[in-house]
Amino acid sequence: MGNRLLVFGVLLIIGIVLSVVWMFFAPRHVMYMSLLLYRQGDADRYLEELDSLSSRLFFNKKLRTLMAIDANLIKGDKEQLNKLFERAAAYKLSSSDRVLVLQKELLFRIAQEENEKAVESYDAIHKAYDKLTDKQKEKYTEIIKEVEYPYTIHVMRDGKYASELMERGDTITDPVPAGVCYLRAAQSYCLKDDQDRAERALNHAAKKLKDTTYFQEIQKLIQTKNYKGVLKYKI
């Protein structure tokens, strides 16, 4: 009996030590990995780290699968993304996590011009959204909007959000998100065959995106008056 109590006591001490270590190192590890991917854009190093022993200790297999999605989106690894989305679909996730995963899958399907799968993802994300609490729905409203715009433009081929996107671009202070709104507005006006407003939206987009890789291409579209060329951007 005494030996059992001693063993239990030792295990309890080890458990406490491990929990303290985990609480100290896990947040630091998450921060380090976030810097790798979202600040440095080093998707390969991030994925190597995600497969390391420390990551396997801190994150379970399901979480590592979900964490790998963003890195592979940056890499543009279509084959790997198809596998990851298939695995994610089989996992039991909260409705909020399901919305986040489906948002990424929907944007991926749109970029790949896989319209049938995009429709499936769109329907699924709304079903997951409907299961959220009212408070959660408020939090995820912007996420739904962010998939609604490209879905309407590239899958439905409808320019109905043109004016709304221009207004959003006017109110957003961060230049890149504002530029994306103007770019989407230009796409929407092209779908409405409104060349004048498409040109105006493209000029606004160029000003906001002057420090990005889009700038030169947008300028070329404006100079050649090839406004419908903006529809190639699946953003």
Model-identified regions with their sequence ranges:
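Boundary/linker segments of alpha-helical solenoid repeat arrays
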Residues: F58-K62, L93-L100, A128-K139, T173-G179, ...
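The tetratricopeptide repeat
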Residues: H29, R64, V101, K139-V147, ...
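N-terminal topogenic membrane-targeting module
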Residues: W22-L102, Q112-N115, S121
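Alpha-helical repeat scaffolds
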Residues: D44-L53, K78-A90, E114-L132, R157-I172, ...
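Long, non-transmembrane cytosolic or organellar matrix-exposed soluble domains/tails
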Residues: L165-I235
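N-terminal signal-anchor transmembrane alpha helix of single-pass membrane proteins
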Residues: M1-M33
